[in-house]
Amino acid sequence: MSISSKIRPTPRKPSRMATDHSFKMKKFYADPFAISSISLAIVSWVIAIGGSISSASTNESFPRFTWWGIVYQFLIICSLMLFYCFDLVDHYRIFITTSIAVAFVYNTNSATNLVYADGPKKAAASAGVILLSIINLIWILYYGGDNASPTNRWIDSFSIKGIRPSPLENSLHRARRRGNRNTTPYQNNVYNDAIRDSGYATQFDGYPQQQPSHTNYVSSTALAGFENTQPNTSEAVNLHLNTLQQRINSASNAKETNDNSNNQTNTNIGNTFDTDFSNGNTETTMGDTLGLYSDIGDDNFIYKAKALYPYDADDDDAYEISFEQNEILQVSDIEGRWWKARRANGETGIIPSNYVQLIDGPEEMHR
């Protein structure tokens, strides 16, 4: 049975952000930017509609298309108030931005026709549409930007509800949490540095980040084989493995002089650990490596780990050891997905790292 079929994923209760979308005027009052900008828009709209009605009633030539622009602006103002009262601004940001952009074109076109027309009443109408154009431009800057943008953060800082959550930062944090579950600590550091350098992983309180329970704990959701199919061919690794190979050979020779039967058993074990930079001795097996580690004293098993789940060793793999849930194991190496460990009865072997958790002190043994 493969190790991947034994993985016991930690049950997670799906979290759901509850949002009240009922109609409440206090949601509109809680945003100073909405109150101030919409209030100025209403005043400007009243000036524009008043000047237009006065100009049209005195038999002065008035551009007919301006009427539709004024009505369209009124619909935009009413829609914005409803979106704030139902707390749906973030859900309709694209619609709001495009609609305001159309209103900006209508108002600037009307301002061009009214400014150069004769008559004092048309001047009042032109002043109203110019003010509406300025307000529309501010709205486009605000609603067209992400909530993580500097301008939006500064504007939302005056709101009672605080800074709005950013969909962009939300997606980045979800990707970061997925990376924390599926990558090694070194890969996580590289990914976190890239996100931090991009400028988006700043202060974000809307979605909590997943923090590891222990700095030395390595979790893996997809256990691969123990063999190294694509070894690193760097000089440092080459030197390290050659040194390890020599230690294994010397230990094997010592065991051969002491116990010929044990040496015969070890040389018959399969799964030869041979890489591109070995010294050519392919008779050394991982069984000898585990035999070498079984002679290590207690001082070298400097870590203690608590079993999160029970684990049954694979019968086809002579290197694995079984353990029970909540059992305390001594660990000598915490690098990689498989750790070298020893049970209380002296049995030594390898264990999957995502089945155990490192413990710091005696108080954690009883949790």
Swiss-Prot record:
Write down the Pfam families for this protein, in alphabetical order: SH3_1 (PF00018)
Q: Where does the SH3 domain start and stop, copy by copy?
A: 300-361
Outcome recorded upon mutating residue 309 to A: Decreases the interaction with PBS2 and leads to decreased HOG pathway response and increased aberrant mating pathway activation
Glycosylation is annotated at 59
Drop me one GO molecular function for this one: osmosensor activity
Fetch the Gene3D superfamilies from UniProt: SH3 Domains
Task: Give the record's keywords alphabetically.
Answer: Cell membrane, Cell projection, Glycoprotein, Membrane, Phosphoprotein, SH3 domain, Stress response, Transmembrane, Transmembrane helix
Specify the superkingdom.
Answer: Eukaryota
Q: What else is known?
A: Present with 2330 molecules/cell in log phase SD medium.
Q: What is this protein called?
A: High osmolarity signaling protein SHO1
Q: Which gene encodes it?
A: SHO1
